[in-house]
C-alpha cells in the first residue's frame, strides 16, 4: 500500500518563533511512518518547512518539506497553511491508496479531503475548541466549515474525548480510537527501577513544574530523603525552577538535565519509579505513552486525555490533584503498576497503530464492494 502522511507541525512550539530541532527522528510521526515502512508499505511524510531539521538527515522513506504561507495570520506553530497540499494531492491522488492528515481544524486537512475525499482519513486529537482568539476561529471552523465541507470526511480520533467532540461536526467519525504510538524496538522496557522519579517536559508555565517540586520536597521530608528527581527538558522557567529547588532545600536531589535525545533520556525514563505530570492544559501527551512503553508508571493530573486509560488499566495514578502520598503509593505498589505497564505497552506499538489504520481502510473497501 502507498501512503501519504501530511503532518505540518512535527513537534510542539509554544511560540511563533519555532526553534528548529537537529533531527525529526525522535518525533512521534516519524516513528509512525517508520512503522509503515518496516511493515512493507511505501510511505511519504510531509512536514512544514519551518520544522525542517537543522542537520542533513537520511531517511528510509520519502520526506517532503512544504512552505507555509501567510505566516502572519496562519502561524506555522498553530495553524500552518501549505498551499502545496491541494495541488500535490490532486495531482498524485491516483498514486496513493491512503492519505492521513492531522486535525479537523486544519486548512491542510480540508485541502487534502477536498482533493481526495475517498482516500483521506483525518487523525484528530483536539477534544475541545482551540483557544486562539477566544475560540472564535475554532467555533466558526467546526460550526461552519467542517459541517459544510468536511461533514462526510472520515475522521479517526486519538481519544474517546476527542471522538465525542468531533463527531458533533463530522458525521463520519469512526467509533474506533487510535492513540499515539511508540516504536517498541527503540523503547525497551525495564522492570528494575532506581530510587528516582522523572519529569519529561518543557519548562513552561502550563506544565506547573513548580508544583512538582513542592510535592517532591514533601515526599523527601515524609517518606524517602534519598530519592532523586530528574527534570528533562528546557524552557523559559528553568532558572526560576532551579532557584526554587535551592529555596526548598532539595537542590541536591533534583537534577536538571536539559533537553535530551531519546537515546539519552531512555535509560533515565526506563529506570525511574514514575513519570510525574502536573499539567493544567494538554491533550494526549506523548511522554506518557513513552513512559508506559518502557514500563514506568505515571503520576498525573486528570488533564491529559491519556489519563482515561491510566485509570482504566491501573498504569499509575491520575487524579485532579495528586500529592506526596500518591508518590508513596506508586512506589509502595510499584510491582503492580509496573506489571500493568508491561502488559499494556504492546497496545502502544506504532505497528499496532498502522494495523488499526489499515483495518479501517479495509473496512471501507469491503463496504464499497457491497
Task: Enumerate the predicted regions with their spans.
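Short hydrophobic beta-strand element within catalytic cores of glycosyltransferases
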Residues: 297-300
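Nucleotide-activated donor-binding/catalytic signature segment of Leloir-type glycosyltransferases, i.e.
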Residues: 240-260
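N-terminal subdomain of nucleotide-sugar transferases
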Residues: 1-51
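Conserved donor-binding/catalytic core segment of Leloir-type glycosyltransferases
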Residues: 4, 191-218, 230
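Membrane-proximal helix-turn-helix segments that form the acceptor-binding/catalytic region
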Residues: 30-32, 138-156, 169
Amino acid at each position: 500500500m502507498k501512503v501519504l502522511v501530511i503532518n505540518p507541525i512535527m513537534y510542539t512550539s509554544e511560540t511563533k518563533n519555532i526553534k528548529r530541532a537537529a533531527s525529526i527522528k525522535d518525533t512521534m510521526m516519524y516513528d509512525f511512518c517508520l512503522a509503515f515502512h518496516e511493515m512493507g508499505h511505501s510511505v511519504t511524510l510531509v512536514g512544514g518547512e519551518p520544522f525542517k531539521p537543522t542537520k542533513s538527515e537520511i531517511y528510509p522513506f520519502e520526506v517532503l518539506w512544504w512552505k507555509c504561507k501567510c505566516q502572519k495570520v496562519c502561524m506555522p506553530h498553530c495553524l500552518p497553511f501549505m498551499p502545496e497540499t491541494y495541488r500535490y494531492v490532486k495531482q498524485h491522488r491516483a498514486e496513493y491508496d491512503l492519505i492521513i492528515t492531522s486535525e479537523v481544524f486544519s486548512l491542510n486537512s480540508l485541502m487534502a479531503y477536498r482533493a481526495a475525499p475517498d482516500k483521506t482519513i483525518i487523525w484528530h486529537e483536539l477534544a475541545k475548541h482551540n483557544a486562539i482568539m477566544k475560540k472564535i476561529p475554532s467555533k466558526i471552523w467546526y460550526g461552519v466549515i467542517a459541517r459544510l465541507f468536511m461533514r462526510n470526511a472520515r475522521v479517526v480520533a486519538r481519544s474517546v474525548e476527542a471522538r465525542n467532540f468531533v463527531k458533533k461536526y463530522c458525521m463520519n467519525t469512526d467509533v474506533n480510537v487510535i492513540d499515539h504510538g511508540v516504536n517498541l524496538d527503540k523503547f525497551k522496557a525495564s522492570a528494575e527501577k532506581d530510587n528516582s522519579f522523572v519529569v519529561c517536559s518543557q519548562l513552561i508555565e502550563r506544565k506547573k513544574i513548580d508544583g512538582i517540586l513542592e510535592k517532591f520536597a514533601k515526599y523527601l521530608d515524609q517518606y524517602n530523603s534519598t530519592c532523586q528527581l530528574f527534570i528533562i527538558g528546557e524552557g523559559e522557567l528553568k532558572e526560576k525552577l532551579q532557584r526554587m529547588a535551592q529555596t526548598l532545600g532539595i537542590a541536591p536531589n533534583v537534577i536538571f538535565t536539559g533537553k535530551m535525545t531519546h537515546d539519552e533520556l531512555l535509560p533515565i525514563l526506563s529506570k525511574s519509579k514514575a513519570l510525574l505530570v502536573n499539567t493544567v492544559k494538554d491533550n494526549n501527551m506523548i511522554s506518557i505513552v513513552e513512559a508506559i512503553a518502557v514500563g514506568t508508571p505515571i503520576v498525573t493530573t486528570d488533564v491529559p486525555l491519556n489519563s482515561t486509560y491510566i485509570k482504566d488499566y491501573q498504569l499509575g495514578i491520575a487524579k485532579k490533584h495528586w500529592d506526596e502520598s500518591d508518590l508513596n503509593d506508586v512506589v509502595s505498589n510499584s510491582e503492580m503498576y509496573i506489571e500493568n505497564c508491561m502488559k499494556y505497552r504492546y497496545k502502544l506499538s506504532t505497528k499496532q497503530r498502522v494495523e488499526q489504520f489499515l483495518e479501517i481502510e479495509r473496512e471501507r473497501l469491503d463496504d464499497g464492494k457491497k
